Every structure is written in structure tokens, then in C-alpha cells.
């Protein structure tokens, strides 16, 4: 398992694009990529942007969430190309972008007020629990 922080997202995804072109591990060996950008908010619905390859296992996320009730709903969207999972999705890596938009902290995202003090961490535990449960069941 790798935890990777990319630089250059707001400059055309330069960091993630470079890594996707020069991976430490061959991309076809990545079982699933999780993009956890912008999850510090309190909306009870979790926004999920899912790659085409990621859709093969996405029903498992829905099943786990239905069983455990981590979020009111998983609000699935098509790829938008505006975050670091996108260069991997274009290369057929299964991935999901979790973003908690529309809560009380969303108005601060990508502004000078996007600070620790204005972040809301209530959705961290359910997000990570959902991911841990998913990984433990992934075939």
C-alpha cells in the first residue's frame, strides 16, 4: 500500500500526471486508487467520482455503505478530470475520488480560508472505515 501526495494539482495535474507516466509500481498492478482530496466537511452524502475500471468494484462500496450506514448516500459521478486520480483513470487504473462537497466547510475549499481551523473532520472516520472494509473484501 502506498500513500502518495502529489504537487501541482492546480497547475494541470502535473504531479500526478508525471507519476502516472513514471510509476514506481506498474500501473496494471494497482488494485485500486483512492483520491481523498477535500473530505474535511460534514455533508452526510459522500461524492464519489469513479473511473470506468473502478466501476467494476463500485457496487461493493454501495453494498458496504448500505450494510454499515457510513453515509446517507454515495453520490456517484462520472470522471471530471479535475483531480489527481484522473491521469490514472485515463490509463485504466481502477480509482475513486471521494470529495465531501456541500457541507459547512465547502465554501472555504481552495481559498485563503482553507485552513485547519475551518476544516470539519466528522467524515474522516466513516470515509476511512468504508475504504478499510472495501480493501478487506476486494477480490
Regions found by a protein language model. Give the residues of each.
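His/Asp/Glu-rich mid-to-C-terminal helical/loop segments that flank catalytic regions of hydrolases
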Residues: 1, 105-139
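Metal-dependent peptidase/peptidase-like ectodomains
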Residues: 7-106
Amino acid at each position: 500500500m502506498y500513500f502518495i501526495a502529489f504537487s501541482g494539482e492546480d497547475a494541470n495535474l502535473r504531479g500526478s500526471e508525471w507519476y502516472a507516466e513514471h510509476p514506481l509500481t506498474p500501473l496494471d498492478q494497482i488494485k485500486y486508487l483512492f483520491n481523498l482530496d477535500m473530505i474535511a466537511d460534514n455533508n452526510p452524502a459522500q461524492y464519489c467520482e469513479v473511473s470506468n475500471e473502478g466501476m467494476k468494484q463500485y457496487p461493493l462500496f454501495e453494498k458496504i455503505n448500505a450494510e454499515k450506514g457510513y453515509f446517507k448516500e454515495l453520490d456517484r459521478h462520472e470522471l471530471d478530470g479535475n483531480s489527481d486520480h484522473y491521469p490514472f483513470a485515463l490509463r485504466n487504473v481502477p480509482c475513486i475520488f471521494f470529495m465531501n462537497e456541500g457541507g459547512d466547510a465547502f465554501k472555504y475549499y481552495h481559498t485563503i480560508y482553507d485552513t485547519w481551523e475551518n476544516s470539519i473532520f466528522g467524515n474522516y472516520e466513516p470515509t476511512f472505515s468504508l475504504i478499510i472494509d472495501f480493501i478487506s473484501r476486494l477480490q
